[in-house]
Amino acid sequence: MATLIYVDKENEEPGTLVATTDGLKLGSGPSIKALDGRSQVSISCFGKTFDAPTSLPKATRKALGTVNRATEKSVKTNGPLKQKQPSFSAKKMTEKTVKAKNSVPASDDAYPEIEKLFPFNPLGFESFDLPEEHQIAHLPLSGVPLMILDEERELEKLFQLGPPSPLKMPSPPWKSNLLQSPLSILLTLDVELPPVCSDIDI
């Protein structure tokens, strides 16, 4: 494969030799060709050769040549518009910066900026923590449902009752006794339905 290296004013002075280490190891000397004020170094290697055209404009040497050309044109078209804008004095600029600083609201240091994306406040949720005066670690609370109390009076009444126990809890009325017969269980489940209308054809 032949490697073409262009030496330009960006890298070195024109006319200087540039040789790769592979060429020195192989012992093959590079051949130099002068094209339009640029020196071209080609090293012969085995395989296919890819030769670049001799006269390349500077824009095509970039990786994104067509994109660069389009942006250069847009910059040229936008250039006169930017020059028409009036120049502001230093006093006006300082006044604008002071106004901008005053208009910015104070940021919350409690939450990082990413948490401002959420529409809710995490502190607004209900907290089920008890005050430190009431200790419930010694109470057997396994199997006790969570009870939400609205007022402090009901909370005081709850603590006056003592520790809750599953044995003292009244059984719900829908719960049937295992010793009852199946017929009595079915009688408890009977529900009166409205009378059927025979006039309506289905």
Curated annotation (Swiss-Prot):
It comes from the Eukaryota. Keywords: Cytoplasm, Nucleus, Proto-oncogene, SH3-binding. A motif (SH3-binding) lies at residues 163-173. One of its GO terms (biological process) is chromosome organization. GO terms for cellular component: cytoplasm; nucleus. PANTHER family: PITUITARY TUMOR-TRANSFORMING GENE 3 PROTEIN-RELATED, SECURIN-3. The N-terminal destruction box (D-box) acts as a recognition signal for degradation via the ubiquitin-proteasome pathway. Belongs to the securin family. This is Putative pituitary tumor-transforming gene 3 protein. The lineage of its organism: Eukaryota, Metazoa, Chordata, Craniata, Vertebrata.
